[in-house]
Design a protein with these regions (language model features):
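Metallo-beta-lactamase
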Residues: 2-102, 107-109, 115
Length: 115
């Protein structure tokens, strides 16, 4: 039996309220989501990643699967602040080894921290 912190009926997503929809729409109007410079910047220095994008224990059990974040490829739903959605896209979609500057390397997106 899988552990769930919430009963099944409470664990299901709910539609955004009208207030939430209006609030998210204001964020979309205030920020320039057509500017993709952040995505270009995040890709700079990319060297390599792993394929498939999963991390496994020696026994083969998957401990981390970035494929589970593929839902972020789309637009933010009305229930999510579009600015936070964009930040999640930047974090999840740019994974692997990067050279930040000469001789300084960074591993990104294989956990919540950068190493």
């Amino acid at each position: 039996m899988a552990y769930s912190p919430l009963p099944a009926d409470l664990a299901q997503p709910k539609p955004a309220t009208e207030h939430t929809k209006k609030t998210q729409a204001r964020v979309r109007e205030q920020l320039n989501f057509d500017d993709r410079q952040s995505f270009d910047d995040a890709q700079r220095g990319f060297i390599a990643s792993i394929d498939p994008i999963t991390i496994k224990r020696p026994d083969g059990h998957i401990t981390f699967d970035l494929e589970q974040l593929s839902f972020l490829h789309g637009e933010a739903p009305d229930t999510v602040n579009p600015s936070l959605w964009r930040q999640a896209q930047l974090n999840a979609q740019h994974h692997g080894l990067y050279e930040v500057c000469d001789g300084l390397y960074q591993v990104r997106s294989f956990d919540i921290a950068n190493m």
